[in-house]
């Protein structure tokens, strides 16, 4: 039993800690009807729908085909590297940062192994670190790019245009820095033959044709979700439609949803709600954060990750714009600052466990550099 709990804790560390915190908070605030008011059902419903839709589109093969067509039209090793990074940056705005990494990091590893050994070894860790930063910083531009944006955007009552305007300077700066990094890295790369591209070399096998029914259905459902994000229709409509469609036509997709993330949200909602009913803690945190919401969010994200930080801190301030900036910048830094970063780390560990330390060094150093630039921009804009 203890062994099973240990295995579960290692696999779902954030969820486990969130549940423990929620349970501990119940000693101070006994369960009652007010618990139901803690939970943001709109955010949970939208998050479920978006995860289900993106999982469905990924299973159909939409992203593989898109990547294949783009890569086949790109010339040279540096061009392919640049495109793999930019795919993470731009598509994370729509399919979320974690899905972008799950989709394109394996593709990058396949392509790197097709390079001459010296060149492949040079790019292996760098491109994964680049993709991770690109996904985290690209996703901050839209309400649906990452979970903390979706939640804080809803709490703030902002329009999509307001959030995009708020984060555009940061995303634009991040894009410029990424392109500079790629060019600097390319200039230092070993001078060996370029990547010759064909369908097999790029790691794509022949695929069966797209299931047009699934593709059309999930694109329609995605459009309905966007209408909900824009507050044109209530969240219950896409939630019911997604559930009905999956139950009737695509049941296997139900298992592809990240339920541990939804459970983490629920546990943290309970924990934060209970803390808000403890006057001493509530007043203490409000004093600590007053006028320092962004920096508090950046620091908190380094320890507990930016999604839990967004959920926790939102209970003690109404300066949601500062939290949006802080939790997005806070996704840089430590490996756990953004849980999406762990996805890339796991791929590297699976590739070669001996590379974990070296990757962590490259990842941390590059994250700190990007964070410094983002913080300089924040102080300039405030």
Per-segment meaning from a language model:
Residues 1-17, 76-77, 207-217, 361:
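N-terminal membrane topogenic signal
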Residues 2, 161-207, 342-382:
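Juxtamembrane and boundary regions of transmembrane helices in multi-pass small-molecule transporters
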Residues 90-140, 151, 311-324, 353, ...:
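Hydrophobic transmembrane alpha-helices that form the pore/transport pathway of multi-pass ion
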């Amino acid at each position: 039993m203890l062994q099973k709990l240990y295995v579960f804790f290692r696999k779902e560390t954030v969820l486990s800690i969130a549940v423990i915190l929620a349970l501990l908070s119940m000693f101070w605030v006994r369960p009652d009807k007010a618990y139901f008011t803690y939970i943001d059902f709109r955010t949970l419903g939208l998050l479920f729908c978006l995860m289900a839709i993106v999982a469905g589109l990924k299973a159909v093969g939409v992203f593989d085909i898109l990547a294949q067509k783009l890569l086949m039209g790109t010339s040279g090793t540096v061009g392919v590297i640049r495109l793999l990074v930019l795919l993470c940056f731009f598509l994370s705005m729509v399919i979320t940062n974690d899905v972008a990494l799950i989709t394109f990091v394996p593709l990058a590893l396949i392509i790197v192994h097709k390079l001459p050994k010296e060149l492949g070894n040079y790019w292996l860790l760098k491109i994964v670190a680049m993709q991770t930063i690109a996904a985290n910083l690209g996703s901050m531009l839209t309400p649906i790019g990452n979970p903390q944006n979706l939640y804080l955007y809803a709490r703030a009552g902002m329009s999509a245009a307001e959030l995009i305007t708020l984060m555009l300077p940061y995303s634009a700066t991040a894009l410029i820095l990424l392109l500079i990094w790629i060019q600097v890295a390319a200039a230092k790369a070993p001078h060996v033959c370029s990547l010759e591209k064909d369908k097999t070399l790029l790691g794509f096998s022949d695929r069966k044709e797209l299931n047009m029914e699934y593709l059309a259905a999930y694109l329609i459902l995605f459009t309905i979700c966007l209408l909900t994000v824009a507050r044109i229709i209530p969240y219950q409509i896409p939630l019911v439609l997604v559930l009905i469609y999956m139950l009737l036509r695509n049941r296997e997709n139900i298992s592809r949803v990240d339920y541990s993330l939804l459970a983490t949200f629920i546990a943290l909602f309970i924990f934060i709600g209970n803390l808000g009913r403890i006057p001493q803690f509530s007043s203490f945190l409000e004093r600590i954060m007053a006028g320092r919401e962004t920096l508090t969010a950046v620091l908190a994200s380094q320890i507990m990750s930016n999604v839990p930080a967004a959920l926790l801190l939102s209970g003690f301030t109404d300066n949601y714009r500062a939290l949006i900036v802080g939790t997005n910048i806070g996704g840089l830094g430590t490996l756990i600052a953004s849980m999406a970063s762990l996805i890339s780390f796991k791929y590297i560990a699976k590739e070669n466990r001996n590379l974990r330390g070296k990757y962590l060094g490259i990842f941390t150093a590059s994250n700190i550099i990007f964070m410094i630039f983002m913080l300089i921009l924040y102080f300039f804009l405030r």
